[in-house]
Amino acid sequence: MTKSELVAQLASRFPQLVLKDADFAVKTMLDAMSDALSKGHRIEIRGFGSFGLNRRPARVGRNPKSGEKVQVPEKFVPHFKPGKELRERVDGRAGEPLKADEPDDER
């Protein structure tokens, strides 16, 4: 699902929201989540999962073209851990083929 598909689904589920308002709501939520993560905070959405940061230590890598050793600095990367309810809901689909173009509300 893309951000624009999420906006469209939000607008269709809540008829009082026009597409512009749904887009604003999604952008505001994503901005707030990005800001929290960039400040090192953890985000927990009960029943869905949590977002946090994982530290990747500095290491020695290789330049693929020259084979030269390159120092790769330490960095933090976003990480998502699904909650129990989400894991169970997804696990209920085990064995079903993945359908990339199937609308979510028809599942």
Curated annotation (Swiss-Prot):
GO BP field: DNA recombination; regulation of DNA-templated transcription; regulation of translation
Lineage of source species: Bacteria, Pseudomonadati, Pseudomonadota, Betaproteobacteria, Burkholderiales
Domain of life: Bacteria
GO MF entry, a single one: DNA binding
Chain's gene name: ihfB
Keyword field: DNA recombination, DNA-binding, Transcription, Transcription regulation, Translation regulation
Family: Belongs to the bacterial histone-like protein family.
Oligomeric and partner information: Heterodimer of an alpha and a beta chain.
Function: This protein is one of the two subunits of integration host factor, a specific DNA-binding protein that functions in genetic recombination as well as in transcriptional and translational control.
Comp. bias intervals (Basic and acidic residues): 82-101
Gene3D superfamilies with a match to the protein in the record: IHF-like DNA-binding proteins
Protein name: Integration host factor subunit beta
Cellular-component GO terms for this entry: chromosome; cytosol
Pfam families the UniProt entry points to: Bac_DNA_binding (PF00216)
Region described as Disordered: 78-107
HAMAP family, alphabetized: IHF_beta
